Design a protein with these regions (language model features):
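Small/aliphatic-rich secondary-structure junction motif
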Residues: 2-54
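General small-molecule cofactor/ligand-binding pocket signal
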Residues: 36-38, 81-85, 134
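A short acidic, glycine-rich active-site loop
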Residues: 52-63
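Structural beta-alpha unit
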Residues: 1-3, 16, 30, 72-105
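Short, acidic/small-residue loops that bind anionic groups at enzyme active sites
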Residues: 128-137
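A conserved short alpha-helical segment within the catalytic HATPase_c
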Residues: 64-72
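Glycine-rich, Arg-bearing micro-motifs that act as flexible, cationic patches
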Residues: 102-127
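Short secondary-structure boundary segments
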Residues: 39, 106-108, 137-138
Length: 138
């Protein structure tokens, strides 16, 4: 029995991650893979009390849904699962990619500094990933 290949893609709402989702969905179409879209969230270190009405998990889920809706237009035949995880993005992606055939990330996320060739999450995944990692450039 052969299992369906899995492509994990990191989603943070940045233009780079939108391009990564498009690239990953095309690859999923070509290979018959399931697309596993992963977003993560965590409280900034400087926040000690959660402000009323703030729900980072729900905000992250909303961003994930919006990016997928826009980026997957025309890819309705691709099977997609969505995962919102509490924690730093690099380790969250690698945990979700343990059984994956491919991990796809954008070259730069929301926190990238102008002129950087590779963002910290992309670099983390390339250095520590256990499966092939594709970095989609802007």
């Amino acid at each position: 029995m052969t299992s369906v290949p899995v492509i994990v893609v990191g989603v943070d709402g940045s233009p780079s991650s939108q391009r990564a989702v498009r690239w990953a969905s095309e690859q999923a179409k070509l290979t018959g893979a399931t697309l596993r879209a992963v977003s993560s969230w965590r409280w900034p270190n400087y926040i000690t009390i959660v402000p009323p009405g703030v729900d980072l998990a729900s905000d992250t889920r909303r961003t994930l849904d919006e990016v997928l809706e826009e980026a997957l237009t025309g890819s309705e035949d691709v099977s997609v699962t969505r995962h919102v995880i509490e924690g730093p993005p690099g380790p969250a992606l690698l945990t979700q990619a343990q059984d994956a055939t491919l991990l796809v990330v954008g070259a730069q996320g929301r926190a990238a500094f102008p002129g950087m060739l590779l963002g910290s999450v992309a670099e983390y995944c390339v250095r520590h990933g256990s499966c092939p990692v594709v970095v989609v450039r802007p």
